[in-house]
Design a protein with these regions (language model features):
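Active-site- or DNA-interface-adjacent structural scaffold in DNA-acting proteins
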Residues: 76-144
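Glycine-centered flexibility motif
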Residues: 28, 74-76, 128, 349
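Extended, structured, electrostatic nucleic-acid-contact surfaces
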Residues: 65-76
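Adenosine ribonucleotide-centric catalytic and binding domains
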Residues: 59, 65, 145-147
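An active-site-proximal beta-strand-loop segment
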Residues: 144-154
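Single, function-defining residue in the core of a domain
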Residues: 1-59, 63, 91, 101, ...
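A short structural micro-motif
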Residues: 66-67, 108, 344
Length: 422
């Protein structure tokens, strides 16, 4: 294997320990806490997410009580915790500490990208993912039916709506009320906050097709936000004018441009066409797809050979709009990574507070892996595995050195890493 450009230990050192210590004081996260201080919970979750693909409270207990973890983060070897104390702490610990820690780390790590590398990060993919749990465990959530196998125990789901910029989530919200089952209700909550933060309006928001109401399109436009989404091919609209001419490039990759038009969308409430102009790009797959509906029961997505994209950006070419929408798939890959490799497919804590703490810590750990895999040109799974193994090698060497009392052999930065948690 070729030499790594960035070591795992270098990335761990980038975690702003001084700022975490300040956050501990300002948020009072450690009030009445002994063994499980805010910083210890922070590092415990990072270590556990890196160590296992599926984490539980009992695994967190096991991790905390290992000499290896305590050595790495300079915790007294006689310190002990139980899974019960971890459960209680997650349900009551101050959430603000983790929210602000995520913001600080996101800002620090995103600065590692050059100006040229950061340009694609103005393309913000917004989408949602659901995670389910049995009703008797999850305190809040959407009831979505019965357990597989005909059991009588219902299941509940939590919706996570995220704005992904290609590096990490710029913003995320957790929804447990059935009002937010519809993307037309959940996604505007995230979009409004994003647009307010983007004072120069440089971002282009790539939206799931569930975001489809005229009211939502108008709200984004009124806030001067730019978006691209997908609409149904039978959407009622009034053509204002065409943007195509003899110089228009109709090659959109695996799609061929059929039309590029300015339209007025139909307002169902007012029963008339809206006066706001939107741009609709009509394209067709070059290789026809099988549109036969499957014989199995249940709701299935309709397969079509045509794709209609909608945007309020009239400056980009149709090809750039199509390429931007294709990037929407990146957030699906990100969700898959979180669920398969960072224990995001189930609930470590079922309390509302604990769920949000785990969310922020999952995203922080994902950032560590994202930087490592990018710099060392690896995939998600191998990147995470290699990160952890490299970290373990370093800890073994550290423990050996400490046991031999050869502290002079330790670099200053290594000692500083150990001293992060008193």
């Amino acid at each position: 294997m070729k030499d790594k450009k960035v070591r795992a230990i270098d990335i761990l050192r980038m975690i702003p320990c001084e700022e975490l210590a300040k956050l501990s004081l300002s948020t009072k996260v450690d009030y009445c806490a002994k063994a499980l201080s805010g910083e210890r919970v922070f590092y415990l979750l990072v270590y556990a997410f890196l160590a296992a693909d599926e984490v539980s409270q009992r695994k967190l207990e096991t991790v905390f009580n290992t000499d290896m973890f305590k050595t790495l983060f300079n915790i007294s070897l006689d310190a002990k915790v139980t899974h019960g104390s971890i459960s209680t702490r997650l349900s009551k610990i101050d959430l603000t500490f983790f929210e602000k820690a995520y913001e600080v780390i996101y800002q620090r790590f995103s600065r590692m990208y050059t100006k040229e590398e950061a340009l694609p990060m103005n393309l913000i993919r917004v989408d949602s993912s659901m995670v389910a749990e049995t009703c008797n465990k999850l305190k809040k959530g959407f009831t979505v039916g019965k357990k597989p196998g005909g059991g009588k125990t219902s299941r509940k789901q939590i919706k996570y709506t995220m704005a992904y910029d290609g590096f990490s989530a710029k913003l995320t919200e957790v929804f447990s009320d059935s009002t937010y089952l519809s993307e037309d209700m959940a996604m505007p909550e995230v979009l409004t906050q994003l647009i307010k933060k983007d004072s120069n309006h440089e971002n282009l928001y790539v939206l799931d097709r569930g975001f489809s109401s005229l009211e939502n399109y108008d709200n984004v436009t009124e806030q001067r936000g730019k978006f691209v989404g997908r609409i149904k091919t039978n959407r009622k609209m009034e053509v204002v004018r065409s943007l195509m001419d003899e110089t228009t490039d109709t090659d959109l990759g695996n799609l061929e441009l059929q039309d590029d038009i300015v339209v007025h969308l139909y307002d169902r409430e007012k029963k008339e066409f809206s006066e706001t102009e939107y741009r609709v790009i009509k394209a067709r797959f070059k290789v026809p797809r099988d549109t036969t509906r499957p014989a199995n029961k249940g709701k299935v997505k309709r397969v079509e050979n045509e794709v209609y994209l909608i945007t309020n950006d009239f400056g980009l070419t149709a090809k750039l709009i199509a390429e931007a929408y294709k990037k929407r798939w990146d957030i699906e890959v990100f969700f898959k990574f979180l669920k398969q490799n960072l224990s995001f497919s189930h609930f470590i804590s079922t309390s509302e507070n604990g769920i949000k703490v785990i969310l922020y810590m999952t995203l922080i750990t994902a950032m560590l892996v994202m930087i490592y895999k990018r710099e060392n040109e690896m995939g998600y799974t191998i990147g995470k595995f290699s990160f952890f193994m490299e970290m373990q090698d370093w800890v073994v060497k550290l423990m050996t050195t400490l046991q031999n009392e050869k502290l002079s052999l330790l670099a200053y930065e290594d000692m500083r890493l150990r001293a992060r948690i008193p």
